[in-house]
Each structure stands twice: as C-alpha cells, then as structure tokens.
C-alpha cells in the first residue's frame, strides 16, 4: 500500500489498558513519520527493525535497518528476545523424521553492539542450533532495545541464515 507507514509504540504500552496513558511519544513518532514521508524532511523517523539473523560460529548476529547509526540497550540485558531451536521429535507413522521447535535459553547479558548489529555471544553454543529469533512477539512486552534515534525496536521474527 502506498503512503502507509508504521511507528513503534511498544515502549509506552500498558499491560492491562489498551489505551496508553503516555500519548505524547506516540504523537511525536507520528509527526516524525509525516515530516519524513509527506513533507520530505530529513528526519530520523524509522524505528529499528530486525532484517536478518546469521549464525557465525557460536554467536548470533541480528542485523537491524532503520534511521539510526547504532543500537542501544537500556539496562544490562536484552528484554523480550526469544531464540528457538529445531530438534528431532521422532518419526511419524510413515517413518518420516519429524522436527519440533522449542525455545532455548541464552544469556541476555552477554551481547555486543556493533553499529546496527546486535551480537549475542555464545547463543549458538552448547549444542544449540538456533533456527529462529523473535523479538517482542508476546501478547505484552516491555522493550529496552532502541536505535540511536531514540525509537524502540519493532517486533520481528527471522529465520537464522546458514551458519558460517
């Protein structure tokens, strides 16, 4: 669709109220979007959005796109990020192998940021073979991952690209 743009309000939501009390940040982000896309102003209006996940050795590299120079995490650990691995689940009645996917734990404090890439150190270690990463994909979430433009990262889900 033309002239349809998305903003992130994930950092101002409330668990039990669909109408967030803090409306100013949402209005500000809508205004940024209008300035950029309707009036052609050079403003940073796009929130970080996950575009790819690559396994490199035991690390996972999550690449973001958007109007920012770098990412930042508010706090010591990344919130609302889930990693999933596929594993063997047996065979079906025809003898065909089946797989299942389950969430795996990782150290949310063991990360590094290089520009617009979030690197989860050792997330793919210890027998884990991460197949998918999901961010802010629960019914309610509180994000703490932002772009240097001050906008919160958008929810995303990405399959992991081949291991290098």
Predicted features and spans:
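Generic recognition of stable, solvent-exposed alpha-helical segments in well-folded globular domains
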Residues: 21, 25-30, 128
